[in-house]
Amino acid sequence: MSKRVTVLMGGASAERDVSLRSGAAAAKALEQAGFEVALVDCDRNPAELVRAITETRPDVVFNALHGRFGEDGCVQGVLNLLGVPYTHSGLLASAAAMDKAFARALFASAGIPVAEGRVITRTDRNGPDPLPRPFVVKPLNEGSSVGVFIVRDNQPSPLPDWPFDADEVLVESFIPGRELTAAVMGDRALGVLEITSDHGFYDYEAKYAPGGSRHLMPAPIPEADYAEACRLAVAAHKALGCRGVSRADLRYDDTVPGQPPRLVMLEVNTQPGMTATSLVPEMAAYQGITFPELVRWMVEEARCD
């Protein structure tokens, strides 16, 4: 008898549309892998989540939610209480990764290089620039590059107008160079991919619009640097306590003549996209792992923690 898998998707975060696409694509792959699949469009109401889980009676929950509630430990906590195994990382790892300031502190303590940065509060918004330009301003707990600003010379800073929902944001030095991402599956890296985009950086549109970005797999960097990027991705996965699949985003700064390139960890995504243009399925395919095989492995690795 095949396992029943409930796919949680949608949600009420800024990444709702992406989650709907991830959930639909994952559901199709799960059916191809032989599972009995139910789809649930989940909001931020824990009582509604409990009702949906009770009605669908899954053996495993496939969490295709992105952003707040689905990615920050809330859904994971509810499923832990219900005793229903679920894919991706557990409560603590999810909460840690979603808080960018806390995650970068864990990375630094594990010897993983991070950009210079600090947390700025709403009350600091009218002060001088928090860091030398160029710098990056990002919400502490959003994904898919939602609400990210790059502040360059002769550009207005968003801080005085404060177009953010939260009272705190993270400000980091902008790292020039190239955009890399590395997928981790269990305790091994699937490889490193370079992303190029005409948008200047890998923003929401570049991530999810067809043709918004170009992917180079494997990343065309020296073998030693490629291996180091893989090592850092696994180290970050372990520093956060992740399980299942994660994706580490890094910068590769090879812009200084006469200086060796440097790798800088930006963040780890514990709920990487599962859309047709998503990176983890692409990197898995490069290793000969089909999308149905990938989601089957994720279901087999599901647990409560």
UniProtKB/Swiss-Prot annotation:
GO cellular component: cytoplasm
Binding residues for Mg(2+) 2: E267, N269
Residues holding Mg(2+) 1: D249, E267
Highest rank taxon of the organism: Bacteria
One Pfam family of this chain: Dala_Dala_lig_N
Cofactor details (free text): Binds 2 magnesium or manganese ions per subunit.
Domain annotation ATP-grasp: ranges: 104-300
Keywords from the named record: ATP-binding, Cell shape, Cell wall biogenesis/degradation, Cytoplasm, Ligase, Magnesium, Manganese, Metal-binding, Nucleotide-binding, Peptidoglycan synthesis
Pathway: Cell wall biogenesis; peptidoglycan biosynthesis
PROSITE patterns, alphabetized: ATP_GRASP (PS50975), DALA_DALA_LIGASE_1 (PS00843)
Ranges annotated as spanning the membrane: none
Family: Belongs to the D-alanine--D-alanine ligase family.
PANTHER family: D-ALANINE--D-ALANINE LIGASE, D-ALANINE--D-ALANINE LIGASE B
Name this polypeptide is given: D-alanine--D-alanine ligase
Organism, scientific name: Paramagnetospirillum magneticum (strain ATCC 700264 / AMB-1) (Magnetospirillum magneticum)
